[in-house]
């Protein structure tokens, strides 16, 4: 529902007062009126209106023509139905025309107003004695609402005159401030302001400092300016200090400089030019009795804060807001309340961009994909979205398509802003940032620390410094991945590219690298090479290409264009690699093995995906530092080397190594090995016992079609995936794997009966598209932690066993033979998906629908809404009477459009609530349906009409506010497909009251 408060209005009166005459008219109200006259405030005078049982039209008109409504709540206020009707009209105007409502509690406890208790409550009950329940309810809700509006409480004031002066000042502030429109188009701004106002705690008397921190270009200054615009009028003095970086460069101990800055600062706050201060302590004398709002924008050093923001200088109620890219500065200055500005959502980012590029909130026809691509390039950074949007304004689609390649690697208009944080770093932290950006983006913090252990950098401290300056983000999950924003990566690449050749530690320019490798012109200063071969044709590498790079730590050769089938680099067999290398990443390596001169004693990670390797190396290597081997999609690989010395190996990835026949027995004693990925190893027949791998948590053997036997596995295993194999059973030893959480055996066509007892720790089971015919009772119902069970496409499954109460998701779509449920569904929190299960018997259907009333959603075949839904209609809309309950069960019959592609599933269901009464208001919500269908399902299309049942609540504004402001008679619900991929044939609603009603509703359900 949209309020018209954003539209300018011509207000006839400044103030309307609602009061009970005998309580306040003679003394308090007369004094208040005199003060308003003194302050030039126009107040509506109701002396000429005769009071009656019904609020007069003239009074309604006056309320609607007043900018501010003051509700004077006294102990007998509720004894007047006139006053209570006035209150309803005031709240109506607040909601619909943006009227400002203020409260004064005159000799009455605010809690008595809210709860209608005490003498106030007695008066209210007497007034309600002969009224309808509807009238009583509206008045009660209105009093509760207005009682929660913070206002002046008479009991807290010793001097009534000062209280009245304060009220007059507050009214003056509210009516004299013209709303600033500068920030109306700032997407998501209100959310930021709400968080900041909460931190500022503007009602408290003490002095408070609050920080706003975040990366460059995120909108910190915009938020600060909006706060200044909105709240500066409530302070005696205010000051917005920007350009601190340029104008307030401060060095500790420069007394004269600090004194001059104090003079400028105080002059700006007090709006008095040419002020002279004799010493530094004078600033406190000038400001300590003044309530000030000070915003220090873009602070970049602790010295600036110490010089310009001491909390002891300012008067009670003062607030200081500090914006910075360095969170550590705020912490060092003792600022505990810090608002960290996050990136906008995907939809918000698109809106921000569109407002700059198209001057509208969404892309015009034909521009959606282009707009999405630019938003991706900007990685949701607001400054970049605005700058790039403006640069594309009023350009054609062809111009956009021509511009996109350049935009992917340019920083037009934002480079200087992004570089500030980087240039403020010391030399070692700059180097750390470049290493992370080029080689270790999205890697775990511990892995970054390990890889850079021999780089002479203080990595742990450096990571903290980079995170405090928002140059990196460290995820807060267990892995603690280090992430660099896309535009900062572009900046880092530009920095590396512009370095002098003899000083370059990191090579990233493809043409320069090609020359160095062909002519062997490297040098000892080079520590990292990141070579994107997408930018070159073919290259003959010199055998001595790396000979002079004696300090090389990181070598990364890859193809960002994913041209993995094209071998571009001719690698000589006798090439020599430095033994200092810690990262050896070479995609599509064309040699059959690494040269015999290769030494791996310093190697931490080897990553050679899509290679032509037949074997990694010959003989035995010293592998004490090796943590990871990734040879995925190396289709010629026939064997792995002896890994018995790789005692610290944690990750082994050989997925899609289709010629690999067996894994070496040497891996059986690698006690730190945690992850083994060997999916689609089509020739793999033998896996040695893994029982001694006490750290193993993840095992993927998907599509190892020749695998005859499930290997022995350790009790440490957490995730087992063996899809698309010929296995006929799971090992009984799984029972003892007390940490097992996920088991995926989809596509196991030879698996007929699922009877293996699993540990109670299991939370995810996927048996989809298997040959399963029967699931024994005991192997599922005792899994008290089971969250989701996927049986999609199990076409031979006839019956479901009893399921545990813990289940949240049951996917049984495309189970062609499924007829019955063994016992009642006792899954109070489960989403139930039975798409295309056309053989379900009546009892099973009844159980599914009944359970859906308790749990979340249900999808099952059906041609019509069950008659027990109290309100039903053909087509996509229906009208139901308004109810005090705000809980509903909704059923729609949907049918997939026949003209859509066969593999398409329903996507988004839109449904709109519209309340109908003496005013009409609407609200729309979206259900995302596509996730209900298993991606591995053989046939996910709805073959016939289906029932979709879901729980919904009336939007809060309709349920909590409108009923006591307007008379609501009916509610209309409309359903539609956002992408026109399905039709709504029927719809139905059941209003829910309490659990007893729900049981009664479905106790007699018949099909």
UniProtKB/Swiss-Prot annotation:
Which signals induce this protein? By UV treatment.
Signal sequence segment: none
Give me the reactions it catalyses.
Answer: NAD(+) + H2O = ADP-D-ribose + nicotinamide + H(+)
* Domain NB-ARC stretches: 190-443
Q: Where in the cell is it found?
A: Cytoplasm
Q: What is its EC number?
A: 3.2.2.6
What biological-process terms (Gene Ontology) are attached? cellular response to UV; defense response; defense response to fungus; defense response to oomycetes; signal transduction
Against PANTHER family, the record matches this protein to: ADP-RIBOSYL CYCLASE_CYCLIC ADP-RIBOSE HYDROLASE-RELATED (PTHR11017:SF225), LEUCINE-RICH REPEAT-CONTAINING PROTEIN (PTHR11017)
Q: Provide the protein name.
A: Disease resistance protein ADR2
Q: Which organism is it from?
A: Arabidopsis thaliana (Mouse-ear cress)
